[in-house]
Regions:
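Short phosphate-binding loop-to-helix
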Residues: 75-108, 117-118, 124-125
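Short, conserved phosphate/pyrophosphate- and ester-handling motifs at nucleotide-, phospho-/glycolipid
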Residues: 249
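Conserved core of the sugar-phosphate nucleotidyltransferase
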Residues: 119-227, 238-242
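Short, charged/polar "capping" segments at the starts of alpha-helices
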Residues: 68-74
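N-terminal nucleotide-binding beta1-loop-alpha1 segment
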Residues: 1-30
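Short catalytic helix/loop segments, enriched in acidic residues and glycine
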Residues: 29-48
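Short, acidic, metal-binding catalytic loop of nucleotide-sugar glycosyltransferases
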Residues: 51-58
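Active-site acidic Asp-centered loop
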Residues: 111-113
């Protein structure tokens, strides 16, 4: 298939852009929301929308935002049809609400407004892989070796499995309504994302044992999750280190600025 195969068109992009009260980056930059911080003269959210705008398989865009991001702040940031909706109680609940709406009907690719190093190449790789799989949901991950080979000093939270360690990329592809079960579970698991052992416990004693013993592979983890949630979920490895570098704190912003300027 060619890179611009029309069979892959028809996607909607959801950008999760809710502001977190007391966000340290927003406070440090004196902004209403951290995604208004700039890299190379463009805000984080403008960079995300710009990458989406240059991805031909995405037809329309939904931004889920709160009062910190009025619709007029997004004017001119994409040439694709754009709608702005409110946020629910956290990112997982927001993603679920949008997926269940008419506007957010699958296929839906989900990312965040702080995913400032997102590029059309990353999106194309992810969407192409998700499109070609018979699945309900795809989750973008980057191998730690991919990240450290480019940016050896970068600090990320890694999930350790037999055969590799991986970082999330704030990229999800919902291909069917059944993906909503994962978003509902994500809401429950979100508080545990920095504690892989507690997260594994949610999937049962066997998953916990295998994880703690270092015997659980990435594919096994997704197979266990798929059975528990009655969905077909798959990981998609993204060969771009930048996909795993979101902007959560001032040091992340500095790193992203260096990367964008070609100085990292």
């Amino acid at each position: 298939m060619s890179e611009d195969d029309t069979s892959r068109q028809g996607w909607t992009a959801l950008v999760l852009a809710g502001a977190r009260p007391g966000d340290p980056l927003a406070a440090a930059e004196g902004l209403a929301a951290k995604h208004f911080a700039e890299i190379g003269g463009a805000s984080l959210i403008a960079r995300v929308l710009g990458a989406i705008d240059q991805t031909p398989w995405i037809d329309r865009v939904i931004v889920a935002a709160d009062a910190a991001t009025p619709p007029e702040a997004l004017e001119g940031l994409t040439s694709k049809p754009l709608s702005v909706v409110g946020t629910a109680d956290g990112a997982p609940a927001t993603a679920l609400a949008v997926l269940n709406s008419e506007a957010g009907a699958p296929p839906l690719v989900v990312t965040t407004s702080d995913n400032a190093l997102l590029t059309p190449a990353i999106l194309k790789h992810f969407i192409a892989a998700a499109h070609d799989e018979n699945i309900d949901l795809a989750v973008g991950l980057a191998d730690s070796r991919t990240i450290r080979s480019r940016y050896p000093d970068v600090q990320r939270t890694y999930l350790k499995f037999r055969g590799g360690t991986y970082s999330g990329c704030n990229l999800f592809a919902a291909k069917t309504p059944e993906a909503g079960r994962v978003f509902a579970f994500w809401k429950q698991a979100e508080a545990l994302r920095k504690s892989p052992v507690k997260l594994a416990r949610l999937f049962g004693v066997r998953a916990l044992f295998l994880y703690v013993a270092g015997l659980l592979t990435l594919d096994q983890a997704f197979a266990l999750a798929s059975r528990k949630l009655a969905v077909k979920a798959r990981p998609i490895l993204i060969p771009y280190a930048e996909a795993a570098i979101d902007v959560d704190k001032p040091s992340d912003l500095e790193l992203a600025r260096r990367i964008a300027a070609g100085k990292a």
